[in-house]
């Protein structure tokens, strides 16, 4: 009897030791799993925070610009010229037409959809020079972002400027027709959309990355004042 009892005790002791060992192993596994999950969650949170902070830094950098530096020769309010020699190069032997417009004007966008491409094509073919002059007639936030980016592209990537210009107006036309002001009445949203349009029309990313949110306030004041004071045949006195 004594031997049987001792054997049972030994078995129970061994079983208890095995249970305790398994419990310790389970605890270690739980600790490892919790630690790994915690590290992963913290890494995800840190990554998201970095992306958000980086995006805010990019926006602030695009907001805090020197318009004179960004716009270069266009800072004085001059138009973008299109002619047979390219963008920014008028042919002095040809007559020069001037088109005044606002990137947030639906009538301007409709006009561009109807005849804009033809006008710039004829200028490129040498029938005339055309001055394409952004002014304020409506003045939504989209006008500011679009004008700023347009003037950057005119300097840094003139070969894509004409396509970009028409695409900017085409986008506004779609938003007006849809009665959707979500983007065009918000400066940051307009800036992001303008960058997308630029990329879609072939503007290099290193140029797109330099687009300011808005460097056009003084430019538009100057160009609008010049337009209002211009002697334009057939125009009334309502401006």
What are these regions (language model features)?
Residues 2-141, 224-225:
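Extracytoplasmic thiol/disulfide redox context detector
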Residues 137-239:
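Cysteine-centric redox/oxidoreductase cores and disulfide-bonded domains
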């Amino acid at each position: 009897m004594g031997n049987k009892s001792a054997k049972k005790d030994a078995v129970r002791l061994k079983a208890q030791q095995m249970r305790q060992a398994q419990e310790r192993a389970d605890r270690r596994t739980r600790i490892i799993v919790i630690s790994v999950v915690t590290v992963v969650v913290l890494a995800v949170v840190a990554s998201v925070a970095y992306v958000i902070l980086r995006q805010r830094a990019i926006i602030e950098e695009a907001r805090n610009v020197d318009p004179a530096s960004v716009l270069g020769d266009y800072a004085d309010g001059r138009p973008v010229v299109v002619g047979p020699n390219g963008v920014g190069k008028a042919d002095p032997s040809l007559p020069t037409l001037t088109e005044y417009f606002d990137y947030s004007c639906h009538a301007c966008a409709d006009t561009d959809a109807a005849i804009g491409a033809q006008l710039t094509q004829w200028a490129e073919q040498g029938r005339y020079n055309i001055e394409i002059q952004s002014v304020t007639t409506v003045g939504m936030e989209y006008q500011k972002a679009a004008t700023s980016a347009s003037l950057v592209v005119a300097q840094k990537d003139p070969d894509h400027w004409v396509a970009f210009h028409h695409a900017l107006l085409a986008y506004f036309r779609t938003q007006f027709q849809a009665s959707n002001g979500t983007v065009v009445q918000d400066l940051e949203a307009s800036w992001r959309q303008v960058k997308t349009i630029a990329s879609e029309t072939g503007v290099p990313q290193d140029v797109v990355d330099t687009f300011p949110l808005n460097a056009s306030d003084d430019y538009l004041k100057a160009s609008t004042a010049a337009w209002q004071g211009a002697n334009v045949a057939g125009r009334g006195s309502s401006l």
